């Protein structure tokens, strides 16, 4: 197999992206850490561990050897955010284009993923693919639109024919950090919406939380230099609406279980898949405080993940002083 594009990460999202890329007949190499995933993809064209029920294209080949990624110019990186840097440092060479598809903030350093990738692969040009996407829908070929934030117009021109498909539409942005911030903050807000659902607080409360959470996303984005129009698009508001309203979201499902009384420690120990928001919440809360950004919903999620009673934390949120909806009206 001579592939022009490879996917690094054999979880649900990585497998779905490989399936989407392979839909036009091009060869796709899928790197997975788990030997059982590699074996099943190659022998049976399935990934029953992470994407059950999806029959994979025969032009997807799986490997567990990073050396097989050598000389492939474009790499979609779909490893868990907290392990991305370590995995990228094992690559035999820096690919021309790294497209980061994981959403999160590095816990130990507070860095966005593009900064982590730039250190690990200094010779690569970095792009961000982010938006309202459920893996099972992308794998099934259902219509999907995403933000593809690129480091240059030249990179966009290279990547769009490789990634765009009739049912998978990337939209160009030059705001790489903004595209990342939307996805990372959204994960934490999705946990909050799940908590509201788990507590049985109703649809009104969820809608209010989405709107006020979006305001927090905008404030944090502004503090880090993101463009407001980026966060109003697919990678911000679009992703927020999708994942704050469905149990198909791992972060929403985690929050729902927290609202129902389970602890974060127990839930994270039981999970096969990663709910990135649980790892992002503590570092996001710390960054917001350090930068003087008011993010009460994010702070509330962080307290609940740390073990605080969800009902009590929500009561504290509802007891906050009344204020103008927009800071410009204050």
Curated annotation (Swiss-Prot):
Binding site for sn-glycerol 3-phosphate: 103, 131, 133, 186, 239, 249-251
Catalytic residues as annotated in Swiss-Prot or TrEMBL: 186
GO BP of this protein: carbohydrate metabolic process; glycerol-3-phosphate biosynthetic process; glycerol-3-phosphate catabolic process; glycerophospholipid metabolic process; phospholipid biosynthetic process
Catalyses which reaction(s): sn-glycerol 3-phosphate + NAD(+) = dihydroxyacetone phosphate + NADH + H(+); sn-glycerol 3-phosphate + NADP(+) = dihydroxyacetone phosphate + NADPH + H(+)
Domain of life: Bacteria
Keywords: Cytoplasm, Lipid biosynthesis, Lipid metabolism, NAD, NADP, Nucleotide-binding, Oxidoreductase, Phospholipid biosynthesis, Phospholipid metabolism
SUPFAM superfamilies registered for this protein in UniProt: 6-phosphogluconate dehydrogenase C-terminal domain-like, NAD(P)-binding Rossmann-fold domains
InterPro entries: 6-PGluconate_DH-like_C_sf, 6PGD_dom2, G3P_DH_NAD-dep, G3P_DH_NAD-dep_C, G3P_DH_NAD-dep_N, NAD(P)-bd_dom_sf
Keyword set includes Flavoprotein: no
Gene Ontology CC terms: cytosol
Disulfide bond annotation, renumbered to this chain: none
Enzyme class at the top of the EC tree: oxidoreductase
GO molecular function annotation: glycerol-3-phosphate dehydrogenase [NAD(P)+] activity; NAD binding
Listed EC numbers: 1.1.1.94
Subcellular location: Cytoplasm
Biological pathway: Membrane lipid metabolism; glycerophospholipid metabolism
Binding site for NADPH: 13, 33, 103, 135, 250, 274, 276
NCBIfam families attached to this UniProt entry: PRK00094.1-2 (NF000940), PRK00094.1-4 (NF000942)
Family: Belongs to the NAD-dependent glycerol-3-phosphate dehydrogenase family.
HAMAP family in alphabetical order: NAD_Glyc3P_dehydrog
Protein name: Glycerol-3-phosphate dehydrogenase [NAD(P)+]
Species assigned in the record: Erythrobacter litoralis (strain HTCC2594)
